[in-house]
Amino acid sequence: MSKIQKKDTEPWVAKYRPKTVDDVSYQEDVISALKKSLNTGNLPHLLFYGPPGTGKTSTILAIAMDIYGPELMKQRVLELNASDERGIEVVRTKIKNFAGYAVNKTTTGTSNPGATFKLIILDEADSMTTDAQAALRRTIETTSKTTRFCLLCNYISRIIDPLASRCAKFRFKPLDTVATIERLKFISQQEGIKCEESVYQAIQVVSNGDMRKAITYLQSAFRFFANKISEDVIYNIAGSLPPQLIKQLVDCCKKNSFDRLQSMVQSIIAQGYPVSQVISQLFDYVLTTKDLNQSQKSHITMKIGNVDRNLIDGSEEFLQLFDLSSYIMKQLNNNSTSTNGDDMLIG
């Protein structure tokens, strides 16, 4: 493959990943604290947690680049995806072997020429088994003179306390609308993409604070549609329902007709939209609408939980979506708030 072809097919997530700590944006508190550690040359074990696509991996790779430079990165950084290599054997062999040997001080060309430690990055560490985490805790204790560990996870509650307590914890918050759109516009400018403001808004909505998703959606849309990107294109790529379709479903519920509602639900199913996604967007509607009072919202939310559980258990999708839609219709057209969320539960 030629260099031009490689450049054209390179994922933009990798292409526009921050190369240094100064390039990392939107996580100012985290970066400020980490810079102080880098300046003192005393990097602790780290635990980064937060939603996907908020910059956890990009930040630690940028830190590693600042410490070691591009050449030593290959020798002194071990990056593992703990969801694939999650068992105790990986800790006992690969991690322990890499962490065990000492290294010389880093030389010129790095921001921290006195660093005498290696770095092990464990992505998706919350997928590791409890036994593997316990073994890792012991490895961290015995190799702290030669190795620093950085654990990345979405759910800090899944990391055992003895392991979490040995790390400096940093929370990565979801990116807000302004930050996401600003970054998308920068990438669009670099790639020569022309989009309406509404397209960026649509990407922000479907990515829900996940910058990795947002950039991937933008690249996919540009690949297939060039500069003819519309809101509908973004919703199709993301597998989300266009807002107007959710509105049509809600309007159908307001008309209080089971026949019309059944036809509407059948139409949505026939168009191939994931029912889990439909339910998620209905949940967003319930939270934000002014057509329902707080009691009605709480009843519908309980119903959504029941339907979601039934879908996970393998219940028929049409029946579950029709059941939920019927319940929303009942609440929208009923002033009584005494309805129980299990009235129409279909297993």
UniProtKB/Swiss-Prot annotation:
Q: Which GO terms describe its biological process?
A: DNA repair; DNA-templated DNA replication; leading strand elongation
Q: Which GO-annotated molecular functions does the record name?
A: ATP binding; ATP hydrolysis activity; DNA binding; DNA clamp loader activity
Keywords annotated in UniProt: ATP-binding, DNA replication, Nucleotide-binding, Nucleus
Listed SUPFAM superfamilies: P-loop containing nucleoside triphosphate hydrolases, post-AAA+ oligomerization domain-like
An annotated GO cellular component of this protein is:
DNA replication factor C complex
Q: Which Gene3D superfamilies match?
A: 1.10.8.60, 1.20.272.10, P-loop containing nucleotide triphosphate hydrolases
**Could you name the domain of life of the organism this protein comes from?**
Eukaryota
User: Which SMART domains would you find in this protein's record?
Assistant: AAA (SM00382)
Q: List the disulfide bonds.
A: none
Binding positions for ATP? 50-57
Q: What is its main location?
A: nucleus
Q: Which CDD domains match?
A: AAA, HLD_clamp_RFC
Q: Where in the cell is it found?
A: Nucleus
- Check the record and name the InterPro entries matching this protein: AAA+_ATPase (IPR003593), ATPase_AAA_core (IPR003959), DNA_pol3_clamp-load_cplx_C (IPR008921), DNA_Rep/Repair_Clamp_Loader (IPR050238), P-loop_NTPase (IPR027417), Rep_factorC_C (IPR013748), RFC_lid (IPR047854)
| Function in brief | The elongation of primed DNA templates by DNA polymerase delta and epsilon requires the action of the accessory proteins PCNA and activator 1. This subunit may be involved in the elongation of the multiprimed DNA template.
Kindly state the subunit structure of this protein: Heteropentamer of various rfc subunits that forms a complex (RFC) with PCNA in the presence of ATP.
Task: Extract the NCBIfam families matched here.
Answer: PRK00440.1
Q: Which family does it belong to?
A: Belongs to the activator 1 small subunits family.
Q: What's the name of the protein?
A: Probable replication factor C subunit 4
Q: Which organism is it from?
A: Dictyostelium discoideum
Query: Could you read off the lineage of the organism from its UniProt record?
Result: Eukaryota, Amoebozoa, Evosea, Eumycetozoa, Dictyostelia
Gene (name only): rfc4
